[in-house]
Amino acid sequence: MAGRELSHLQQLEAESIQIIREVAAEFDNPVMLYSIGKDSSVMLHLARKAFYPGKIPFPLLHVDTGWKFKEMIAFRDAQAKKFGFELLTHINPEGLAQGINPFDHGSAKHTDIMKTQGLKQALNQYGFDAAFGGARRDEEKSRAKERVYSFRDRHHRWDPKNQRPELWRTYNGAVNKGESIRVFPLSNWTELDIWQYIYQENIELVPLYFAAKRQVVERGGQLIMADDERMKLAEGEQFKEELVRFRTLGCYPLTAAMHSEADSLEKIIEEMLLTRSSERQGRLIDSDQSASMEQKKRQGYF
């Protein structure tokens, strides 16, 4: 009897599950980085499938900044309660004490201290030797050249010239003490693949991904939503109600919404089939050339 041919999404799913299982078997202390976005939700779903009916054998880590959307934090806690996974949270105590924020200190400094340094603190504190991330190669050019097993030195830095060959899905996870690997099971997925898989598997998401009327202010050609009373308005700025959704999620002052009527998964997929703009155009941290994604990753970013 001829073997059953896997669909495109089934092939991606099988590849990702194999990577997750291999890391769990190969490394002593792995962790899954959980940013609460759509890619993290897919990665969590794959991890649950990989070890079903057992529990996920490693913790999930959320590096908080204090500036995430309230709906993201509520969703994170609800998912942990629903699925019973071990959830670790960390926020940079020095940055918190200094009052680091995106309004007064700018996106580059805020991202470095609260995200990059915060992540490195958490990895050092728990001694993780492998960290799963939800990055995909189609997102951004520096991620396009990163391996599935991304080697990091003792300071969590990435050197794009010091990468290991990955032939026939064979991964080299050998590390010395203090070194680690960032692992990207979704490397070969596209944004459209993610949305189609979410639809197929009925994966829950933060409601911010769906179009709704929200209070936003136009700033630098971008629509920024006020999520709490800390939102600062410049002279002449005022809030207006717009029908918008978020294509990507992060710290709310640094994440722009987009005009959209896509209030369902079907409509979002249709929108993705027609769009020609970058997924990360709404991430204000990517607009600073001096703090490009590759430079951030060299310093230890996700």
From Swiss-Prot:
It is an enzyme of class 2 (transferase). One of its GO terms (biological process) is hydrogen sulfide biosynthetic process. Pfam families: PAPS_reduct. The keyword Lyase does not apply. Disulfide bonds: none annotated. Keywords: ATP-binding, Nucleotide-binding, Nucleotidyltransferase, Transferase. Residues 280-302 are annotated as: Disordered. One of its GO terms (molecular function) is sulfate adenylyltransferase (ATP) activity. CDD domains: Sulfate_adenylyltransferase_2. NCBIfam families: CysD, PRK05253.1, PRK12563.1. With CysN forms the ATP sulfurylase (ATPS) that catalyzes the adenylation of sulfate producing adenosine 5'-phosphosulfate (APS) and diphosphate, the first enzymatic step in sulfur assimilation pathway. APS synthesis involves the formation of a high-energy phosphoric-sulfuric acid anhydride bond driven by GTP hydrolysis by CysN coupled to ATP hydrolysis by CysD. Heterodimer composed of CysD, the smaller subunit, and CysN. Belongs to the PAPS reductase family. CysD subfamily. This is Sulfate adenylyltransferase subunit 2. It comes from Shewanella baltica (strain OS223).
